[in-house]
Amino acid sequence: MNVKQVINRAFMQIGDTPQEQYTPYHLLEYYNEGNHLLNALIGQYCPSLAQATHEDNGTGRITLPGQCISVLNVKVDDADVQAYHVLNLQTIVFDADHEQKITVDYIMTAGYKKLEDESGLPAELETLLVDYIVYRVMNLDISGVTANMVNALQSINDGLGNNESVIAEGYWNYGSKRIDYAG
């Protein structure tokens, strides 16, 4: 479904199908806002839905084709890199003394969609974006929609067989990765 169709569904729900009170571009702004929120939640709760991979050769540095919101994994010659830094949301650097094959798994930024663009999302998540738009237009609290997004992403993740563990995180982050305890 393209973005204009998603926005038309929101127009139906707010009772403004003649588009007298709001323009499609007004609702497009809410769509992009909701899409950015959803993309961040996808990175946290169901990364396989939006995971991208980039490979290149380099000496301790690789530049991604676009900005990312999360780096899931960095490998050098098929071995995990534990210590790396992300610069300007696009460049990954680490200590190396010779050229190697570098592979990065990451979550891209959502970017800004235009009306004619495809949403690229499953229908269930498009419906949640419609809900988000309606809530923003009506100035309602979006915490309920956000909770529904999290629940939907966890259900999708469970359905993909990716959630067979309990996630434990400490109070203080210290920049470490999360610990998954398999059940």
Question: What is the meaning of each model-derived region?
Answer:
Residues 9, 13-24, 33, 37:
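Subunit-assembly interface segments of extracellular/virion macromolecular structures
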Residues 52, 71-74, 133:
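Generic beta-strand hydrophobic packing signal
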Residues 62-79:
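Solvent-exposed beta-hairpin/edge-strand motifs
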Residues 1-9, 29, 36, 40, ...:
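Internal mixed-charge
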Residues 51-65, 113-123:
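Surface-exposed ligand/attachment interfaces on beta-rich extracellular proteins
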Residues 21-24, 45-52, 146-151:
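Short, glycine/acidic-rich hinge or "gate" loops at secondary-structure transitions
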Residues 36, 40-57:
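Extracellular ectodomain segments of secreted/surface proteins
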Residues 57, 64-69, 95-99, 174:
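A generic structural signal for short, non-catalytic loop/turn and secondary-structure boundary residues
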